[in-house]
Regions:
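An N-terminally biased module of ancient metal coordination in phosphate/nucleic-acid-related enzymes
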Residues: 1-82
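Extended substrate/RNA-proximal surfaces in nucleic-acid metabolism proteins
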Residues: 62-177, 258-265
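Active-site neighborhood of phospho(di)ester-bond hydrolases with catalytic His/Asp-centered motifs
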Residues: 14-16, 49-52, 87-91, 149-151, ...
Length: 265
């Protein structure tokens, strides 16, 4: 049974960025830990998550790697009686636009929900690897009718120091994913200030946990509560409505594409 929900909180929250699959990347190392995280999510009011293991230079997980893990974990959730739906996805790092485009066109990436609607895009932690043509890359993705969601820019020192790098990405159509732990100050004051400022000045944002385990996860309800307290209930509701729109879109697409089970074959 879910925990009581705070005012304004929905019982159908979706987390679009989390590392919940056991033994796949730098998330939980055991099935028990993943199930513990799943129970935490359910108690938090989350019903759907997109599992987003890393796809970067050292952990380069593609849809053929990810889909079987998602299928297997959904079976474990069902067996454990945990009412959480896990959809496929990945956190795809773009440090070389040409390489990104090549893999995108080869259809090897696992976008959110394994669909062609939303994709979670991360930039390198190193400014030297931030592509000079990142705006063109965002436009290129948008031309393919997909919405890139840029993962946690508030945690990247170069976006904080040079916000002029981020604004053109937003202008080109990217949405921005803010991590709840940033708002709560768990990644330091600079990330917190940047995240708050962004949410005050931009509508195109999504809250996500970027959970890696039960210790590195504050859930989503704490994030929406923080926004309600500091930015008002209207802003919090707007963020919830946007996430709900994504949830409905991804769930609707699950019915139109082959099942995760059959795709994992
Ligand atoms: Fe992540």
């Amino acid at each position: 049974m879910n925990a009581p929900l705070a005012a304004g909180q929905t019982s159908r929250m979706i987390d679009l960025h989390c590392h919940i699959l056991p033994g796949v990347d730098d998330g939980p190392t055991s099935l028990n830990e993943s199930l513990k995280l799943a129970r935490f999510f359910v108690a938090d009011g989350i019903t759907v998550v997109t599992a987003t293991p890393h796809c970067h230079s050292s952990i380069h997980l593609l849809r053929s790697d990810i889909l079987p893990h998602v299928s297997a974990f959904n079976r474990e959730l069902k067996a454990a009686g945990i009412p959480l739906i896990v959809l496929p996805g990945s956190e795809i790092q773009a440090f070389n636009s040409a390489a990104y485009r090549r893999e995108f066109e080869a259809d090897v990436f696992c976008h959110l929900g394994d669909s062609r609607t939303f994709t979670l895009l991360e930039f390198s932690w190193s400014e030297e690897l931030f592509p000079a043509d990142s705006v063109e890359l965002i436009k290129w993705i948008r031309e393919r009718n997909m919405r890139p969601i840029v993962a946690h820019p508030e945690r990247h020192h170069y976006f904080r120091q040079r916000p002029e790098l981020l604004q053109p990405l937003v202008d080109a159509g990217a949405w921005i994913q803010i991590t709840v732990d940033s708002l709560l100050g768990n990644f330091g004051p600079e990330a917190k200030v940047f995240a708050e400022r962004f949410l005050r000045t931009h509508r195109d944002a999504i809250l996500a946990s970027d959970a890696h385990n039960t210790k590195r996860c504050s859930g989503l309800s704490a994030g929406y509560a923080w926004v309600t307290e500091h930015l008002g209930s209207e802003r919090s509701q707007d963020l919830l409505d946007r996430a709900e729109m994504v949830r409905m879109s991804l769930m609707a697409e699950q019915a139109t594409i082959p099942t995760i089970q059959s795709k994992a074959g």
